From Swiss-Prot:
Mg(2+) binds at D91, D93, D95. Homodimer. It comes from Rhodopseudomonas palustris (strain BisA53). SUPFAM superfamilies: HisI-like. It comes from the Bacteria. It catalyses: 1-(5-phospho-beta-D-ribosyl)-5'-AMP + H2O = 1-(5-phospho-beta-D-ribosyl)-5-[(5-phospho-beta-D-ribosylamino)methylideneamino]imidazole-4-carboxamide. Binds 1 Mg(2+) ion per subunit. Binds 1 zinc ion per subunit. Its cofactor is Mg(2+); Zn(2+). Its EC number is 3.5.4.19. The gene is hisI. NCBIfam families: PRK00051.1. It is an enzyme of class 3 (hydrolase). GO terms for molecular function: magnesium ion binding; phosphoribosyl-AMP cyclohydrolase activity; zinc ion binding. Zn(2+) binds at C92, C109, C116. This is Phosphoribosyl-AMP cyclohydrolase.
């Protein structure tokens, strides 16, 4: 990756400077929040390693690192529902990425839903936490897409 090391930079350089200095965690990952570029809705939260971040910058498609599979993946490589990146941002200390995307096919979640955030935390009559579906319509059948 062509970015400079965050450890070699003064805090002001990281927070106010114009050089990309992503701060990856001990596992070499950085959190990525992905939102719909039009609505602003959060579609998913995933992780990127240095290679995924660079591929995203270079290609304009969203690339992530799967912790469970321990591998790099391009969003949509199995489903065809590619995320086209319209804007990328880093937070103040460059340890989180925010990408605004155009979501191909309308669904970002592997469950077939538009967003991975399709359940709201409410309380039942006893006050216990309860998950309530919101925007939970499936746009595709995962069993047919991920064979």
């Amino acid at each position: 990756m062509s970015a400079s090391s965050p450890s070699s930079a003064a805090p002001d350089d990281v927070e106010e400077g114009l050089v990309l200095r992503p701060k990856f965690d001990a596992n070499g990952l950085i959190t990525c929040v992905t939102t719909d570029a039009t609505s602003g809705d959060v579609l998913m939260v995933a992780f990127m390693n240095a290679e995924a971040l660079q591929k995203t910058i270079d290609s304009g498609d969203a690339w992530y690192f799967s912790r469970s599979r321990a591998k790099l993946w391009r969003k949509g490589e199995s489903s065809g529902l590619v995320q086209k990146v319209l804007e990328m941002r880093l937070d103040c200390d460059q340890d989180a990425v925010w990408i605004k995307v155009e979501q191909g096919g309308g669904a970002a979640c592997h469950t077939g839903r538009r967003s991975c955030f399709y359940r709201r935390i409410d309380r039942d009559d006893t006050g216990a936490p309860l998950l309530t579906p919101v925007d939970a319509e499936r746009l595709f059948d995962p069993a047919k897409v991920y064979r």
